[in-house]
Regions:
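A short, structured beta-strand/loop element
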Residues: 208-210
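Active-site-proximal beta-strand elements of phosphoester/diester hydrolases
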Residues: 212-215
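N-terminal beta1-alpha1 cap of cysteine-dependent amidohydrolase-like domains
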Residues: 1-106, 117-124, 128-166, 172, ...
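The feature captures the ABC ATPase H-loop/switch
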Residues: 112
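Conserved G/P- and acidic residue-centered "switch" motifs that form tight phosphate/ATP-binding loops
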Residues: 109
Length: 239
């Protein structure tokens, strides 16, 4: 059985640091990809990237409540911004190494933003404050199903990775983010755009293997939503 590494958050639970990956990601790897999920911790001393790459066949970079530290792209953070700099220290070097090595990877939500920052891009920290932009945040005080409900359409790049995987030109996606791509990293290319022009998915022009980043959460209904099924099936074929 192929193995897919799932990068964990480092969070406090009952005053203790824990390494966490939501069950939806684990289930999507197990059932949507047909691979063994392997949790990769984000430790205060980052693990050796070469050792990680040697033990897995692919990597999944997950979403998280925290944000990539703005210092990673030369900006400052507002007071109260939730960060996970231990995760940054694990994921950013790992993304660069995986891209260089041609390791198949799928990056979701925070992982999508990490991919852009790791390769030299930057982020808008508060999309809803930009003139003419949608509010990409999830509804407040809503049920979990309502939070992850389809929120807006995305339009795929013609002949791009998502268009080829899904056979679609457009699809509805969920939206649970307040940050997003500002400057696109060298080598990355837009795969999907929201109605306000915000980049919602990327691939890499020089990728040696499957490399896809999406701002939305395909893991939430990976077995039901046609686009999500296509994404995880494409990832599986690349392992």
């Amino acid at each position: 059985m192929k193995r897919v590494g799932i990068v964990a958050d480092r969070r406090l639970f009952d005053g203790m640091a824990v390494h966490q990956a939501n069950d939806e990601y684990v289930a999507a790897v197990r059932d949507g990809v047909g691979a063994m999920p392997v949790i990769i911790p984000s430790t205060d001393r980052p693990l050796d990237t070469a050792a990680i790459l040697s033990m897995v066949d692919g990597l999944l970079f997950t979403g998280a409540p925290s944000n990539v530290a703005p210092s990673q792209y030369g900006a400052g953070a507002r007071p109260g911004t939730e960060l996970d700099e231990v995760r940054d220290a694990t994921t950013l070097p790992l993304l660069r190494a995986a891209t260089k090595a041609g390791m198949p990877l799928l990056a979701i939500c925070r992982g999508f933003q990490e991919l852009n920052v790791a390769l030299g891009g930057s982020l808008h920290q508060h999309l809803h404050e930009l003139p003419g932009r949608l509010d990409h945040r999830e509804p407040q005080n809503a049920s979990r199903d309502a939070e992850y409900a389809q929120a807006h359409p995305v339009t795929f790049a013609q002949d791009g990775v998502l268009a080829r995987l899904s056979g679609l030109r457009q699809a509805m996606v969920n939206s649970l983010h307040h940050q997003g791509v500002d400057r696109l990293a060298p080598g990355l290319q837009a795969e999907a755009l929201a109605p306000d022009g915000q980049i919602e998915a990327v691939s890499h022009s020089g990728a040696k293997a499957f490399l896809l980043g999406v701002q939305w959460h395909p893991e939430w209904r990976f077995a039901e939503d046609p686009l999500s099924c296509a994404i995880f099936a494409g990832f599986a074929r690349a392992l």
